[in-house]
């Protein structure tokens, strides 16, 4: 079974590195959802030899994913991580705000 994964903060350095790691491990791009702020909506991020389109976090449906990797900073995590968790999504937050 493949997990559907949201990379929240996909346009930042850590988010791009997470995309690189998943691509290097041959994860299917159809299971990856790059997410960022509304100002980044529609931009493209590299995923191996493919480009994925970034979705705005305020329009993204957390029910689409099984796992969300947050690397967008404490304020984003504080606001959005609980909403992802409420949709039965596993949340891994690198901001440490929820510790």
PLM regions and their residue ranges:
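N-terminal Rossmann-like NAD(P) cofactor-binding subdomain of oxidoreductases
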Residues: 1-97
């Amino acid at each position: 079974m493949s997990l559907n994964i949201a990379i929240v903060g996909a346009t930042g350095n850590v988010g791009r590195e997470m995309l690189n790691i998943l691509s290097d491990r041959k994860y299917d791009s159809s299971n990856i959802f790059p997410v960022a702020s509304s100002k980044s909506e529609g931009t493209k991020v590299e995923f191996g030899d493919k480009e994925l389109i970034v979705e705005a976090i305020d329009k993204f449906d957390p029910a689409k994913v099984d796992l969300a990797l947050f690397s967008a900073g404490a304020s984003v995590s504080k606001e959005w991580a609980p909403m992802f968790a409420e949709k039965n999504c596993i949340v891994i937050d690198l901001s440490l705000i929820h510790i």
